[in-house]
């Protein structure tokens, strides 16, 4: 029988717990797939067949040793601002909807989500479902297709995850269970306390109290830990702490920043800081303009804050400037919107590249890619072949600059400004090495290349989970 992991709130660790359970089951020889009916995130991933899903479900698929598919996250909401989100349905753009209108769509979306869930059950047998946000959002019970409505339809065991680091864990757990609709309360079969710091023995009486209050077994207390797993959403940026390393990289924290998981390998070898629009860019060795859900609006915000002048000043000082996806579009001369990405009009770009971009349709390019870096730059020259994925609206006229990658991107004559549509570029060790080696050498510092073949983080996660959680009790839930 499948099971469902729900939370007392957002950011309690549901995604990671699902990934841990998936890897633990796979290591026992049990085939399992992850599923989240509805996710809201600007960090997304492109499946092999060109569908877009949340990065968390891709991560969970990897934990289950599967290739991600669109059925694992049939509904993805990508916030655009002004209480409006783009709805991605079964991997492809469905429509932009205000929140009030979205709830009119939930019966149809739930039907599609249940069909996707059914296909996963048919193929894999076992499915670990992840809820969204807090399970006890009482004002949404009649339309919450990620928690209550879904749980009522599926009727499968629920495991509740709570974050003790925030404080108030007793109220979190007790309140969530008591506020669940009466038919769902008996489905709560276990509780996991996550992000514990210190000696767990101190919390032994806390476990007893929670079990007495709720009548539900505490399956385990998971310590606070750090593993190189992809971040799910913008809440995670606030948790990032840059390392005290000699090379500093500024990633512009655009208002609608997306796919900042692109830089998580760099974070291990450089002081990567997410600098908000208006923040100082002085003293950085490299500036990266990342992807964004709203290129034109974020370019306007960047300009209003004066960050455009800081970027242009850094360029004059010989600081590398790199644009990824929407950041690549911003680096160009012009952006023309026919009313599909933002308000219709023509907007000047930063002018660091000669390219120009037009948003002429609502369609989106989504595909996995393999590219060869052009040996025309002191940074690109040693990258070689790299892989990644594209998720973007708009078509770019490349202009007169040199090609940066085979079939993608542009680079200036001196090689210090380049843009690409390729998300995941710097998750390639060769690409991260190429950039870091250049930056370290420029400061006359020795750089040691990234060592590949390190321990699988999902196995490390599973080992930690097994150490602190009663995994046999979870397996028993599946067997009922």
From Swiss-Prot:
Pathway: Cofactor biosynthesis; adenosylcobalamin biosynthesis. GO terms for biological process: cobalamin biosynthetic process. PANTHER family: COBYRIC ACID SYNTHASE, DETHIOBIOTIN SYNTHETASE. Keywords: Cobalamin biosynthesis, Glutamine amidotransferase. Pfam families: CbiA, GATase_3. Residues 246-431 form the GATase cobBQ-type domain. One of its GO terms (molecular function) is catalytic activity. This is Probable cobyric acid synthase. Catalyzes amidations at positions B, D, E, and G on adenosylcobyrinic A,C-diamide. NH(2) groups are provided by glutamine, and one molecule of ATP is hydrogenolyzed for each amidation. The active site is at residues 325, 423. The gene is cobQ. Belongs to the CobB/CobQ family. CobQ subfamily. The lineage of its organism: Archaea, Methanobacteriati, Methanobacteriota, Stenosarchaea group, Methanomicrobia. It comes from Methanoregula boonei (strain DSM 21154 / JCM 14090 / 6A8). The keyword Repeat does not apply. CDD domains: CobQ_N (cd05389), GATase1_CobQ (cd01750). The keyword Glycosyltransferase does not apply.
